[in-house]
């Protein structure tokens, strides 16, 4: 008898499809578009700072600032420097936030974009320093500030130094505000921990993308502490909008236009 030739299973490249975390459908990458929105349920996929820049600011208007700042690893935390180096190599980023200036339909602003691909955009000394310097620069140059937040919280490898960044950035936000300048925050998934407890919620206007997770501690931690069952979806942008913690939920495709209008209305710089 002749042996039947085994049928070879074709290999499908990993990057060809993406599974939607919300509806669980397998989506052809090209169908997600530049905005990375699920065509089935309209879930907003998490995107990198580079992808965010491509869909949000005018052409080549972004001018990066405050690069090359490095953590001194204050606790000599085991394998921390190795983790930083590996993440930098993988993402092409120096740190969890990209800072600079950019234009939104001709409206110039100081801009920061946090990237959850970099150690979950945890806030350490470098993130704190870059954002603080951005606010100080914006105050000197009379520029509004726009920040896209995303974070898992404070960076545990830097201990109390990471927590100190909450007060440090908040003080810079206050000085910028005292100068009569506009500050806009856009909360993206997830915005949690010390970032939520400080500058993410200090904007003059607070926008959020649909279904963004926003909170300080996790649901289980809160329920264990208060010994109560919390409402379904209480840490989602829609719940926070209903209770007055967020000013508006804006579709990713509408963000650039919305930001430009707000900057123009609040005396943005041209």
Swiss-Prot record:
GO cellular component: acetyl-CoA carboxylase complex
Keyword Zinc-finger carried by entry: yes
Known EC number: 2.1.3.15
UniProt-listed SUPFAM superfamilies: ClpP/crotonase (SSF52096)
Stretches assigned to the CoA carboxyltransferase N-terminal domain: 16-270
NCBIfam families in alphabetical order: accD
The family this protein is said to belong to: Belongs to the AccD/PCCB family.
Protein name per UniProt: Acetyl-coenzyme A carboxylase carboxyl transferase subunit beta
Species of provenance: Streptococcus mutans serotype c (strain NN2025)
Gene that encodes it: accD
């Amino acid at each position: 008898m002749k042996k039947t030739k085994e049928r070879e299973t074709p290999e499908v490249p990993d990057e060809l499809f993406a599974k939607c975390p919300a509806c669980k459908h397998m989506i052809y990458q090209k169908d997600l578009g530049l905005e990375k929105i699920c065509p089935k349920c309209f879930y907003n996929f998490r995107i990198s700072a580079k992808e965010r820049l491509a869909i949000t600011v005018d052409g080549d208007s972004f001018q990066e600032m405050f690069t090359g700042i490095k953590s001194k690893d204050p606790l000599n935390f085991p394998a921390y420097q190795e983790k930083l180096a590996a993440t930098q190599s993988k993402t092409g980023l120096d740190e969890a936030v990209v800072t600079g200036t950019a234009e939104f339909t001709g409206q110039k602003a100081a801009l920061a974009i946090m990237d959850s691909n970099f150690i979950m955009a945890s806030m350490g000394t470098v993130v704190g320093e870059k954002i603080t310097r951005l606010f100080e620069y914006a105050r000197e140059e009379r520029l509004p500030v726009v920040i896209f937040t995303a974070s898992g919280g404070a960076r545990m490898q830097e201990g109390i130094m990471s927590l100190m960044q909450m007060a440090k950035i908040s003080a810079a936000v206050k000085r910028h505000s005292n100068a009569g300048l506009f500050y806009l925050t856009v909360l993206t998934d997830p915005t949690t921990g010390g970032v939520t407890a400080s500058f993410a919620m200090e904007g003059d206007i607070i926008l959020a993308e649909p279904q963004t997770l926003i909170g300080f501690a996790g649901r289980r931690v809160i329920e264990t502490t208060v010994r109560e069952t919390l409402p379904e979806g209480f840490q989602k942008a829609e719940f926070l909008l209903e209770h007055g913690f967020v000013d508006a939920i804006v579709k990713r495709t509408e963000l650039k236009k919305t930001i430009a209008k707000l900057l123009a209305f609040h005396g943005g710089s041209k």
